[in-house]
Amino acid sequence: MKKRNRAAMLVLAVSMVTTPIALLHPLSSYAYDGKSSLEPIQLPADIVHLLTELKEDYVPLMKDLHVDSYGGTSKSGYVINLSDRKSVITTNTTLNISTNAEGDMTQFVLHDVNRDKTTKINKKEAYQKAVDFIRNYIAVDHVISPQATLSLDRASELDHLAVVSVYPQLNNTWVDKETARVMVDSKGQVVGFQQDKVKLPTPAEVADPSKAVPLEKAMKEWQDKVSMELVYDESAGKLVYLPEQLPTIDALSGEEVQSVYKTTSETMKIKGTADMGVWRDTKKMEQMLEKDFGLKLNQRTYKNVKEDKKYKNSDIDRHEWNASSYQSAWITLDRKSKAPIEFKLDGPVEKELEKPLTHDEAKDIAVQFVEKYLLSKEQSFSVKETSLVENLPGWADQNLVRPISSFAFHPEIDGIPTKRPLFYMEVDAKKGNVVLVQVNDLPSMPATITKDGIVKDEKAKDAYVKEANLRLAYWYPKVGTHSAKLPQLAYLPTADAKSLQIDAATGAVEETWLEWKASH
């Protein structure tokens, strides 16, 4: 938030009407909570300026909003809540803004149930809008991602949004740890902003960037290790080559950093017997949770957010069974079709397994879930499996690392997998069961795919490595959500390098959307 004079106060009138009114530029301000009389809302002048700026430059939808409530001080920071609410129960759009004691905006969340999720996002324009927002409202020294990524997170209602991330610097070197992000919708409107305080080590605690090996040496090692995979790009309807593995290079030694994960791929024909009606019936979902996951539902509080007015016109339903001490369950469904979007168990179990599952046992459990609850026909998949290596590095706290095996089920056509998986699953070896399921909405696939006339993978790799670049960074090694306390100096592929793919028919290098995922 730009620094302004906070001494001036502007009193905005409060009206107990049930339709929006234009009292003072830029926004009408009234509170509706069912009471017969309310005191005037007083907003500091800099908050009024902030709201004016946002409406004029970034959020045109604010012209239809009014201030519902406001609190805080210049010493503690402010919280401002706006909406288009015309009565206690009718709300389509809400906007929540928070600032800190320094006067900087820390959070901005626009929730519009009628947001357009079909119009194609203009990647360049969305990026420029986000960059302009960042330069106006983030005062600290930072590095802006060179391109926007695409959020597809339906479970959090963050799908179909362009995301531009912000990173800190240390020793004039990029730190690969997101400190802020801006989200832009298909209309070029800013709908989300989050800024977090990231504690960085002192310059003396990390490696000196001047000690890094030359970029050319790192590039040679990296290029030798890169491999390409032929996949079917379901959104473009064609075959492409993607970088299958993007290694990290230790900047002090010039050698590849060994991964903490083992990855394999297996073709599997799965005979699904799922009765998809389970997702349409709350009682059947509860039977599943009790029988297959051992949840004691009489010890949990059920909530259907469909009944929450915030989600009144949403395109999702979320069923929650919340527990204060042990695992909570959340099931997110498409509101119209009742198809599952996400299944999640979070929190400790009452008793973990004395002997953790092996990776093969975890795979069996994942496949059984697909057969029983997600797939109602026979289908071939390329299953990409990830598990932890046996001997984790010293920075990994064994008490904090969860033994997670993940499985991405990519539909396979004539031996070629799709670019995105249909199902993604995680199994916790100590809990002994599935803890996360995500279902993607993929377009219809062709019955057959021919590889006739496509370029060879060697040619595709040559084309890719000629365009891909590395950058020096402080990189935090991670295992799941657990990361090292101190970053490692490393050469990482740039965002541009990660977004490249090769058209298998022509050998041309193409830029595509990278998918954004929350880091925690």
Per-segment meaning from a language model:
Residues 2-520:
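Long, terminal "pre-/pro-" and other extracytoplasmic accessory regions
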